[in-house]
Amino acid sequence: MVDYILLIISTALINNFVLVKFLGLCPFMGVSKKVETAIGMGMATTFVLTVASLSAYLVETYVLIPLEAQFLRTLVFILVIAVIVQLTEMIVHKTSPTLYRLLGIYLPLITTNCAVLGVALLNVNLSNNLVESVLYGFGAALGFSLVLVLFAALRERLAAADVPRPFQGASIALITAGLMSLAFMGFTGLVKI
């Protein structure tokens, strides 16, 4: 049980996919202008990442390995992720039309979010079992959501701040992301595996 908690903590904080592995930067920079949108995107991505990790494990274990078709892994994972994202999009559209409008193009873009595919591929390469695969995906999703919401809150504060003209826009956003990455480096050594 402790190993599972450490797995979640290490994927969320220490090996954060956005700040350490630089995966998922497109939604990180694009959806992080308002906290409400970031929370919605974080929830949708959490669902997709967790289910995609489970699905990737099942497809790899029960379809690709028995058929000796591991060379199709990336293509099959992209198709599985696309199906999961479409289901998520339908659920969000039915349950929260406002959130659906706020997320706009970023919801279908979860399909091409490199973090989702990256987590699925890393899960397979790490040879995690079923529970570890789901927890790895969930921890990665928690880390993504945490960073996204924190970054959105910082960007809202920066929008109200008196930022010098050369640093306005993407410049201050990238500087802030770099400082967040440095702050998350403080978690290094938190978990010894």
UniProtKB/Swiss-Prot annotation:
Keyword Protein biosynthesis included in the entry's annotation? no
Origin: domain of life? Bacteria
Q: Where in the cell is it found?
A: Cell inner membrane
Subunit-structure text: The complex is composed of six subunits: RnfA, RnfB, RnfC, RnfD, RnfE and RnfG.
**Function comment:** Part of a membrane-bound complex that couples electron transfer with translocation of ions across the membrane.
Q: Which family does it belong to?
A: Belongs to the NqrDE/RnfAE family.
Q: What is this protein called?
A: Ion-translocating oxidoreductase complex subunit A
Q: Species name for this entry?
A: Actinobacillus pleuropneumoniae serotype 5b (strain L20)
Give the taxonomic lineage as stored in the record.
Bacteria, Pseudomonadati, Pseudomonadota, Gammaproteobacteria, Pasteurellales
Question: What is the primary gene name for this protein?
Answer: rnfA
